[in-house]
Amino acid sequence: MILREIKVKDYLSKSKLGEYCINAYVGCPHKCRYCYASFMKKFTNHSESWGEFIDVKICDNPIDTKKLLHKKVFMSSVTDCYNPFEAKYKITRKILKQLVNVDCNLRLCTKNKLVLRDLDLLKQIKHLELAVSVNTLDENFRQYMDNASTIA
């Protein structure tokens, strides 16, 4: 796994999936065979296959939460914001702390139980849609399709 820390000015980007997207990471270590986000590789400078790299976005600027007022925000539209590196970097938690008092419609998608760490913050978000992937209970099939999610 190739890991790079990259400096960014902002975590927000305009999107057709919502009005804004927040992706604190580029790439994803989950290596799911069915992943729709693998098209993102062409926008990176990586020669590695999708699932073999992750860029950790480091942003010192606070999110301009005024932009998000009454907007639809999709967090982790092309990565998993609770990927294993989130345990170290805590970027998702930092972002959620900024969104707690913002009246926006937040959609968050993950397949990692690390999401449980942030339940204290997620409970405070007024309009939250939390999607958690549970792909299969067949461990052999899971190992073939999805190297990351657990059935425990």
Indicate where each model-derived feature is located.
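N-terminal [4Fe-4S]-dependent radical SAM core
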Residues: 1-31, 36-74
